């Protein structure tokens, strides 16, 4: 079924998991609040509404995580210095305890979006030491990008997925430029990180406090110190942003430098061409597969009422709360056990 859904998406024909639901007139329950409160959305035969709907179950997060995992696994296999979700980069700029609380919350909730509004800290998806071309910061730059690579340095990366039917695909840039939807989304990442850093600075380091003596706060300074945050964006049709392509190329170069003799290639450049082609195929298959799986998972919620969706969401929240309580109880048990441990010098050791 995954293959059939992926092919239907690529060819622009009716989606196998949405076609029958659309013929039966089934709907997706509308939100409880807002301008569209109580207004159900009819399922379309192509599955666009199913793909972009915000539903319980965390399917969009699963799609994001599986895609990101494959990309960073490629980087690690190639020998690039890769750190996933580096939570200590901003630790020194945050008050004591705030970063630890953010990390604990992310672990308990299975959250991979630490930079989202309302979170306690800034947690990028990865920090990778790499040499890449200058980041694209405008639509014009995307048309004729600079391909000269900058010196090796640690960069921050954030993975995003763009689903069919969202505003990114309806924009003028998406209609005008090939890959415009993912490029535009990638260029939004830097601004989102800086806004979130500024928000945290306002909370923890208001202007005038000892640590906020510069035009920008200490948390935003950390973001700026890492150059521009790179957006690794994957689209609904298997396309990806320039930074994904450049990262795959850099991984292939690193692997070719290390393995070209072992591969039996006459030169490093021949090994590079083989490796980069395999990385592109591998990444493309995973990106398309996860988009198809996302649509299949989402289709399970078609026809349910808003009350049923709310009940599912509340049950998942209760399960998360129970996991959090269990973690706290386990930590407390360790503390109690440690209090009864007799030091070695008292045991005569």
Where in the sequence are the language-model features?
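Domain-level cores of phosphate- or acyl-group-handling catalytic modules
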Residues: 82-84, 127-128
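Long, charged, glycine-rich C-terminal linkers/tails
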Residues: 84-90
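Gly/Pro/Ser/Thr-rich low-complexity, intrinsically disordered segments predominantly at protein N-termini
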Residues: 42, 70-73, 80
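Non-catalytic C-terminal interaction segments of nucleic acid-processing enzymes
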Residues: 1-36, 56-59, 72-73, 77, ...
